[in-house]
Amino acid sequence: MYSSPLCLTQDEFHPFIEALLPHVRAFAYTWFNLQARKRKYFKKHEKRMSKDEERAVKDELLGEKAEVKQKWASRLLAKLRKDIRPECREDFVLAVTGKKAPGCVLSNPDQKGKMRRIDCLRQADKVWRLDLVMVILFKGIPLESTDGERLVKAAACAHPVLCVQPHHIGVAVKELDLYLAYFVRERDAEQSSSPRTGVGSDQEDSKPITLDTTDFQESFVTSGVFSVTELIQVSRTPVVTGTGPNFSLGELQGHLAYDLNPASAGMRRTLPSTSSSGSKRHKSGSMEEDVDTSPGGDYYTSPNSPTSSSRNWTEDIEGGISSPVKKTEMDKSPFNSPSPQDSPRLSSFTQHHRPVIAVHSGIARSPHPTSALHFPATPILPQTASTYFPHTAIRYPPHLNPQDPLKDLVSLACDPATQQPGPPALRPTRPLQTVPLWD
């Protein structure tokens, strides 16, 4: 469990996030925030941070509370989950956790069909490519936002344009990097009092290469504030260190539903057979407008809609963001199961008055039509008019069981005696009696 249970909202308790959170490097929080602080300082003062100021910011970020880092990582994972195609989310979790061989994980493209860019901080002025974010988040490699050209996809990657699998992404090492690595290695060898023999030509293999420290210092200036040892150490530290969520992949596979009710005791995540509380969608901070559609592209469910609810993770993977029930499934529902005596009347009723309602595939349907519909005492979502339900009154088929709690509503809607008086009907009037004028 988290050391501070109230620090996370219901959005950070998704199994996708809980499974990946222990694999996020704590260095990612420090790195993204450090780059943002440097850009903000430059815009405000029109000059770069001094080494002392940058080092102070680095120490401040490294000493941040674990709850803050975990909350930031959870929000970023929720944003990444939204940008990963639903059919690839499960494979992504299994690959990162080591339960499955890594395969291509496709992301949703931008309007030009290329890799999307997202912001990694709130109110950030910088956007990062998704593959860059994945490398920094799960490998702890200090890359700049302009280092997208240095990323190289593996030969086994079948979709190099949109794949964000961290195991398929590498960093191209240039000659300059190798040259600098030589001096770093020699410096570490001198500090450990164990000089090494450098790599030279065939005639100079037996001769040690001496390190000209003066020439190195005159040619290169270190711009960062991380030392080599410190950089390697912090880049390997996970964001969850001993206080992570009480979650395992076996628990995820054994329980497919989850409860996002923040009012539970101690914020402990329960796993009932159904879920009732609504979940709020994150707004992705990308350069392009986010157009959220289901894989079919035909339906979209409003977050303010009464049918919005937390759904099964596996169903979310198979059905996408909003997966409406097929017509055959609606026909099998208790509301569309006519009794023998009502079949003729119902067939004519449902043919012309069948309610058109988009229903989530994750909403549990009871096998008994007499089951009561339980709603929370307080509304989960604000009572606003939804554009997806233009009619305020919905007619239901008149074959509901008398014990159904909707009986009063149905009888009120279907009883002609209780209908609102409409315009007066035109009745045939008595024929006028014609009286001859000549009588």
From Swiss-Prot:
Residues with Omega-N-methylarginine modification? 365
| Compositionally biased tracts (Polar residues) | 334-348
UniProt signal peptide: none
Residues carrying Asymmetric dimethylarginine: 365, 395
Task: Give the N-acetylmethionine positions (modified residues).
Answer: 1
Which family does the similarity line name? Belongs to the CTF/NF-I family.
Spell out which residues are annotated as carrying Phosphotyrosine. 300
Q: What keywords tag this UniProt record?
A: Acetylation, Activator, DNA replication, DNA-binding, Methylation, Nucleus, Phosphoprotein, Transcription, Transcription regulation
Q: Which organism is it from?
A: Mus musculus
The entry's note on the tissues where this protein occurs is: Highest levels in skeletal muscle. Lower levels in heart, liver, kidney, lung and brain. Very low levels in testis and spleen.
This chain's function reads: Recognizes and binds the palindromic sequence 5'-TTGGCNNNNNGCCAA-3' present in viral and cellular promoters and in the origin of replication of adenovirus type 2. These proteins are individually capable of activating transcription and replication.
Q: What is known of its domains?
A: The 9aaTAD motif is a transactivation domain present in a large number of yeast and animal transcription factors.
- Motif residue range(s): 9aaTAD: 404-412
User: What is the predominant subcellular site recorded for this chain?
Assistant: nucleus
Q: Pfam families, alphabetically?
A: CTF_NFI, MH1, NfI_DNAbd_pre-N
| Annotated region (Disordered), positions in chain | 265-348, 415-439
Q: What are the GO cellular component annotations?
A: fibrillar center; nucleoplasm
Q: Is Chaperone tagged as a keyword?
A: no
- Set out the biological process GO terms recorded for this chain's protein: DNA replication; negative regulation of transcription by RNA polymerase II; odontogenesis of dentin-containing tooth; positive regulation of transcription by RNA polymerase II
Indicate what this protein is called per its UniProt record.
Nuclear factor 1 C-type
Q: Where is the composition biased (Low complexity)?
A: 299-312
Give the gene that encodes this protein.
Nfic
Q: How does it assemble?
A: Binds DNA as a homodimer.
Picking any one GO molecular function of the record gives: RNA polymerase II cis-regulatory region sequence-specific DNA binding
